[in-house]
Amino acid sequence: MKRTFQPSVIKRKRTHGFRARMATKKGRQVLARRRAKGRHRLTV
């Protein structure tokens, strides 16, 4: 059985990156929530 985590910087950025978050309304809500909480890193 292969491992489920096969790291790839491209996939990581495309699914969880800042621009990916900004692209949807829900993604912007995620960023707003993380800003309100005071996270130093909003995205990966």
UniProtKB/Swiss-Prot annotation:
Q: Which Gene3D superfamilies match?
A: 1.10.287.3980
Q: Reply yes or no: does the keyword Ribonucleoprotein apply.
A: yes
The answer on whether this UniProt entry bears the keyword Ribonucleoprotein reads yes
Task: Tell me which domain of life the UniProt entry assigns to the organism this sequence originates from.
Answer: Bacteria
Q: What gene does this protein come from?
A: rpmH
Give me the ranges of the annotated region Disordered: 22-44
Q: Which UniProt keywords apply?
A: Ribonucleoprotein, Ribosomal protein
Name listed for the protein in its UniProt record: Large ribosomal subunit protein bL34
